[in-house]
Amino acid sequence: MRNFTALADQAEKAIREVFSPTPLQRNEYLSALYGAEIWLKREDLSPVRSYKLRGAFNAMRKFSDKKAFVCASAGNHAQGVAFMCRQLQVNGIIFMPVTTPQQKIQKTQIFGGEFIEIRLTGDYFDDCFEDVRMLCSHC
């Protein structure tokens, strides 16, 4: 059986080399409303303003020997992958639906810089995912 505490500790140590921890903050209003201690994890204070960066980091570090990454996302995961491509200095292709808000596309490009290429395709995530599968089947 795996020692998940040790694995979590390893992941935390590795992630701290890339970005700082986000704080827990007690929410006075919700605590009073529900008569309980309500704390919020402030992922909005991470570099990409989302917890999705953690998933992108952990997935990509497992394959750090790869020279490129591909993903399909309509938003926050795309930004996490873009940020990590720049951090790891690896190339990435990010497929996003054509319906993705321009602000989300621009932020993704800013996070990834010259390390990423954004491809707008299809109206829905499933369309993007199918294009990713097709691209990867040719690799």
Regions found by a protein language model. Name each.
Residues 1-139:
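PLP-dependent amino-acid enzyme catalytic core
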